[in-house]
Design a protein with these regions (language model features):
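Solvent-exposed interaction patches of small proteins and small membrane subunits
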Residues: 1-112
Length: 112
């Protein structure tokens, strides 16, 4: 894997770790997430970074073995362009249900 792709994978991994850090001292509850604007904005920003990094990866490695690669880019685009209709429950679901698996996939690629 080329150096630039590894850098983008590391950017995604760093964003995941940052989101985990945001949540480590807070209850992992949807209500807490909804009531904390700073937390939501921090998560949104990291999702934007992950989506942009994935978009750059897909341009050079279109068959990267990441299950939801295209959805990550689509989510980034939605967060940026449809910010006024972004539903907190969808964002929360991504954090709780999708990030742990994505983290595993990225770790495998970074170790390989």
């Amino acid at each position: 894997m080329d150096r630039q792709t590894l850098k983008h994978l590391q950017d995604i991994y760093s964003s995941i770790l940052e989101i985990e850090e945001f949540l480590c001292d807070r209850p992992k509850e949807f209500a807490t997430f909804c009531n904390d604007t700073l937390l939501r904005r921090g998560i949104e920003r990291n999702i934007e970074i992950m989506g942009e990094a994935m978009n750059r990866i897909l341009k050079t490695v279109p068959d990267i073995p990441i299950t939801s690669a295209r959805k990550i880019v689509d989510t980034r685009n939605f967060v940026i362009h449809a910010y006024d209709s972004l539903r907190p429950d969808i964002l929360w679901s991504i954090v709780i249900n999708n990030l742990p698996f994505l983290k595993q996939e990225i770790e495998i690629l970074l170790k390989g």
